[in-house]
């Protein structure tokens, strides 16, 4: 899991984030966290779990 900053809001509850390492990724909200995380906007810091098969995708685990 890595820390990232939201850079853009995409359709279908997806977000474009930039990791602390500088990598740009497309992520969605984890199903378990969807009820906890109410709203995410550009500039919010989040913790992202990277997908095993595609390092350019992941899921938001929690908001910092």
Task: Show where each model-derived region lies.
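Structural detector for short beta-strands of small beta-barrel domains
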Residues: 1-11
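Short nucleic-acid-contacting surface segments enriched for D/E, G, S/T with interspersed K/R
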Residues: 33-47
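OB-fold/S1-family single-stranded nucleic acid-binding modules
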Residues: 52-64
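Short aromatic-glycine-enriched beta-strand elements
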Residues: 11-17
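Short, mixed charged/polar active-site loops
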Residues: 1, 24, 35, 55
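A short macromolecule-binding patch
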Residues: 23-31
């Amino acid at each position: 899991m890595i820390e990232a900053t939201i850079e853009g809001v995409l359709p279908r509850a997806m977000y474009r984030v930039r990791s602390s390492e500088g990598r740009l990724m497309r992520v969605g909200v984890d199903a378990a966290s969807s009820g906890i995380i109410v709203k995410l906007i550009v500039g919010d810091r989040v913790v992202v779990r990277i997908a095993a098969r595609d390092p350019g995708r992941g899921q938001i685990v929690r908001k910092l």
